[in-house]
């Protein structure tokens, strides 16, 4: 087997360059504060089954590439979701539904975010409606159904599924739990990012 560094398809110099190495970390906290992240941790760490996930050192790969360390955060077993986005959507569901009568939550997704929203709704006994494009695999749709979500397949791509989610949610007074922001829709994506930050 060839090593990665000998494989001509890898653009080695571009691969290891990090154009954002000197980014201003304080800019992150101007959008999402440490207090908000700490609040997410306080809630999520009290969920049944919560535990830290491992940070793996990919020694062989870092050695082959001549990089001191490459770390991989293994989120695959978090709450049995098999998703790297396990925390964000579920946290947003909990925060948005707090102190409200029984609500229905909705989202558009290609899979991972929807799985988190579906699981978050299931653990709180809420109805969940998920909109996916025609290109999302049936395995992903089934994974969301397994957490109690009703899944709607929409003709077209992700953008089409998001438009349909917004349309149906407005019509039926469902709470949209989306991981992207738009004008006058920033709170839920911010809560989702706070959940991701717990990773």
Placement of each model-derived feature along the sequence:
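PLP-dependent amino-acid enzyme catalytic core
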Residues: 1-199
């Amino acid at each position: 087997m060839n090593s990665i560094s000998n494989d001509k398809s890898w653009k080695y110099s571009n691969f290891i360059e990090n154009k954002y190495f000197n980014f201003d970390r304080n800019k992150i906290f101007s959008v999402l504060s440490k207090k908000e992240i700490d609040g997410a941790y306080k809630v999520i760490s009290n969920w049944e089954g919560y535990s830290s996930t491992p940070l793996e050192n990919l020694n062989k790969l870092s050695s082959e590439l001549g990089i001191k360390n490459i770390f991989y955060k293994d989120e695959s077993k978090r709450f049995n979701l098999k998703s790297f986005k396990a925390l964000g959507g579920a946290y947003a569901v909990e925060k948005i539904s707090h102190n409200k009568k029984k609500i229905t939550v909705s989202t558009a997704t290609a899979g991972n975010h929807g799985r988190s929203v579906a699981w978050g709704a299931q653990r709180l006994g809420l109805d969940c409606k998920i909109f996916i494009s025609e290109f999302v695999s049936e395995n992903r749709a089934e994974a969301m159904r397994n957490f109690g979500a009703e899944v709607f397949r929409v003709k077209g791509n992700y953008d089409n599924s998001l438009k349909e989610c917004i349309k149906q949610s407005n019509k039926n007074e469902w709470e949209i739990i989306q991981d992207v922001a738009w004008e006058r829709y920033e709170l839920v994506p911010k809560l989702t990012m706070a959940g991701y930050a717990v990773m």
